[in-house]
Amino acid sequence: MSKKIAVIGAGIAGLSAGCYARMNGFDVEVFEKHTLPGGLCTSWRRGEYTFDGCIHWLTGSAEDGAFYKFWNELGALEGKEIVDHEEFYRHEFEDGTVIRWFTDADKLEEHLLTISPKDELPIKKFCNSVRKLSGMKAPMDKPFSMMGFFGIVKMIFSMLPYGNVMKFAQHTTVGEFAEEFSDPHIKESFKTLLYDESMSLSAILFTFAGLHNKSSGYPVGGSLEFARGIERRLLDLGGIIRYKTPVSKIRVEEGAAKGVVLENGKEVSADYVISAMDLKTALEELLNGRMKDSVYEKYFNTERLFPSCIQVSLGVDMDFSEEGDYLTLSIPVRQPIAVGGKRYDTLQFKHYAFDPTLAP
């Protein structure tokens, strides 16, 4: 008789865990309080328009990408067209200056040098790092704990060519590297490339590395359709998904999870439980705070909060196909906006003319 796994949450993590559990012979039952799969990887339908809420670029969208093997096994990209943007970010300033952060590192280097030749050193340092990391193939076949001695040695040797770049990137923030630019427009624009200038520079470098080698594209159809692909795969494998079925408690016997208690009071037994939901809620509510972990406690109590983000989506009867092939456009505002205690002088704009499935 097969052993059973109960999965809490039908987001990408929960659906993926369910798929791989079924591939390895486990019975799987997924419990999701929403009516749809995907969790945060979602879209909203309003009339004839679809407003996307998650995927801007997908790591591993190309066949030579490290994550492609997993997306392919999960059915996430089956029949999907991938769009690779020319520009990751376009920043327009009030004085008319436009900084275009091209996804191609060669094109980006040429553009930035045209704007500020005196910044040749940091420009080439950034673009060379992107090109270097774009060739990195991270070992993804096994988790570190299962690699064994020779597997670990092989991994270490495969990563040696990238050691200097990674060490520099991990110990430098976005804001710190921005200060290496003397041009005020490039400096300001670089600080706003991602959500917060206190983030590690490695986040930007790895993002641009994936964009440069065209393995971080956008799957046409949007985020919910992407999640639907994994949902179909799980169902085809024989997994069960229970929507509108919130879990109120994880049942623990002799220190081991042995099932879940649903909000309606029903108990479901399982040999293993995978919590693919908000970790803080799982530990404090579903486990009643009984399972303490010093690492997670540190994250909960000492780490900085992620910056606030507000998305306003508009379905308009206009053709934006000539607007430009960029992922995000940053434009100045006449009056600064305060969100979450922080002041913003720009608005970031996206159009989805590149995805014909989202509008009539």
State where each predicted segment sits.
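Mid-domain catalytic core of redox enzymes
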Residues: 218, 248-360
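Active-site/ligand-binding neighborhood in enzyme catalytic cores
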Residues: 131-237, 244
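Residues located in well-ordered beta-strands
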Residues: 29, 246-248
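Conserved active-site beta-strand element of glycosyltransferases/polysaccharide synthases
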Residues: 91, 241-243
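N-terminal glycine-rich phosphate/pyrophosphate-binding loop and immediately adjacent elements
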Residues: 3-135
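Short loop/edge segments at beta-strand edges and connector loops
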Residues: 84, 243-245
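A short, glycine/Asx- and small/polar-enriched loop/turn
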Residues: 95-96, 198-203, 251-258
